[in-house]
């Protein structure tokens, strides 16, 4: 008899409530290559043992419920249940533990981030026995990864489409984000692109409002792209935000972008949802469009250290669902982002194989089995003085996006774009000559100012700007004696 139809009627059914740990805490379990592995930060309520808390997470996110049910005997619980297989205390934190849970692959629908998250980060996060719960990391097994298309094109294909190599790409978010007419918006796009940027961008909340309907914006931005390409001889793009109230409307906007011949569209993947995002990613691959992803709403989910979900999990989910770019913080700008943690999930976005490294917040070795990579986008409160640090931190395979750092230039948009392009080219040249950007960065920018008045003006405006606030979501100081999980 197959495990799916095997029953346990002979055992008999005994109604009542029993501790989760009797069924779902299995420290002797050896994980399988096909298991989805999760690392949860668990804060039990007073009086709840960590083993019971970890087992409750495994149960409530897989096959369990609060009481024994007779229908357990109609299936093979051992085949389908989640298992809490290891628990370790969090150093320096009182009553916090990392609970490792293994999920059998058969619990999840193929190619569906929506289904995976509905189980793993579903109702269990409201469980009363837990004071707080956070999903720190997931190990996606190759067997499950292979059921996803992933990014529409990936890093190498994007570079080939743009014919741009050996440096980060430059972008700019058009400001003010709301209120411009479509024609004025297109004018701002044109000035930035002709000044030397590779991309400009719709802000995440630019959809189709009364002051600027989406079709008008698409037309004026396409005009700006073609005019700037003709003047500069470079391929240009603008992230046309296709996010809409329905999936049908979203695809309609993407179809119009394709008909205009532009290279890239955009989606807000968390507010739009993973089902919509995956649908759009499939359309983009089939029709030659790059897909830029904004992470609006992520901080609602990932900002607090003891509850929610770390962004590295959202980044992995996006790579599965599909996107060629995703915003990833800056480390040096106005938005939250610990350096080591950021570099950890940047590698998870770009690389094919990433080793476990708890010093960077990576709990599991991740093999992407040739799934295309995603370009991290550094955006938020950055300007020309940050260029050396950004080039050193993110490397060539990234997009550096300056909104106010372009449009806030005292001479206008095009000079602002020139300043950023000159600063980037100076940093790349200095790096290629063997100079240390972390040490000599400011000097490299000052030298470039001598032959670029646009850069000199930008440096003068932003010389005093700092965002020196402590990072909330930092990596735990690990005690090597407790980290025994591969």
From Swiss-Prot:
Q: Report the cofactors.
A: Mg(2+)
Phosphothreonine: residues carrying this PTM = 330
- The answer on whether this UniProt entry bears the keyword Plastid reads yes
The record's cofactor note says: Binds 1 Mg(2+) ion per subunit.
Q: EC number(s) of the enzyme?
A: 4.1.1.39
Annotated substrate binding sites = 123, 173, 177, 295, 327, 379
Which InterPro entries does UniProt cross-reference here?
RuBisCO, RuBisCo_large_chain_AS, RuBisCO_lsu_C, RuBisCO_lsu_C_sf, RuBisCO_lsu_fd_N, RuBisCO_lsu_N_sf, RuBisCO_lsuI
Q: Which residues carry this modification: Phosphoserine?
A: 208
Record PTM N6-carboxylysine, positions in chain? 201
Q: Where does Mg(2+) bind?
A: 201, 203-204
UniProt-recorded Gene Ontology molecular function terms: magnesium ion binding; monooxygenase activity; ribulose-bisphosphate carboxylase activity
Q: Which residues form the active site?
A: 175 (proton acceptor), 294 (proton acceptor)
* SUPFAM superfamilies to which the protein is assigned, alphabetical: RuBisCo, C-terminal domain, RuBisCO, large subunit, small (N-terminal) domain
- Tell me where in or outside the cell this protein is found: Plastid, Chloroplast
- Similarity comment text for this entry: Belongs to the RuBisCO large chain family. Type I subfamily.
Q: What does the record give as the function of this protein?
A: RuBisCO catalyzes two reactions: the carboxylation of D-ribulose 1,5-bisphosphate, the primary event in carbon dioxide fixation, as well as the oxidative fragmentation of the pentose substrate in the photorespiration process. Both reactions occur simultaneously and in competition at the same active site.
- PANTHER family in UniProt: RIBULOSE BISPHOSPHATE CARBOXYLASE, RIBULOSE BISPHOSPHATE CARBOXYLASE LARGE CHAIN
Q: How does it assemble?
A: Heterohexadecamer of 8 large chains and 8 small chains; disulfide-linked. The disulfide link is formed within the large subunit homodimers.
UniProt miscellaneous comment: The basic functional RuBisCO is composed of a large chain homodimer in a 'head-to-tail' conformation. In form I RuBisCO this homodimer is arranged in a barrel-like tetramer with the small subunits forming a tetrameric 'cap' on each end of the 'barrel'.
Q: From the Swiss-Prot or TrEMBL record, give the protein name.
A: Ribulose bisphosphate carboxylase large chain
